Amino acid sequence: MATKQAATQKGTKAYTTPRSFGGFQIPITMQSTNLRTYCEKKGLVFHLHVVENQIPNTYLVLESLVEKANSYDGIVMCSVSMLPNEPMIRKSIVTRILDQGCKLHFTFEQIVVSSLEDLTELEELVSLVALSTSQQMPTNSLDQIPL
């Protein structure tokens, strides 16, 4: 039964980045392992990862993946923080993926975006993540205590 189901699936393409995201700098191999494990647990057919360019604020590989989204059931990445920071660009990418019948999976947040309604929730989550990472945490250093 699982073999027949796997044969009808287009599969899930993994997207990784060498850049830091959401305050993390995670090696590509660890990202790929995380994505593969997620797909195995969810019963998704895993396709090897693609790697984004190192150049900051460019998404050439992601854009290429968007153009081929109809070839997959889903695209999986570690975090919503891997998407472009610019809301209009992010919304355009996600909408074009959804329009091709493809879902977006985010393993750290454990969410799947499969509809425009989910896009609204995704935008709220991205706003919260951006807010939380922009806040400076107070330091409790003994060096700062006057003697």
Label each region the model flagged.
Residues M1-L147:
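Short, structured surface patches at the beginning of a domain
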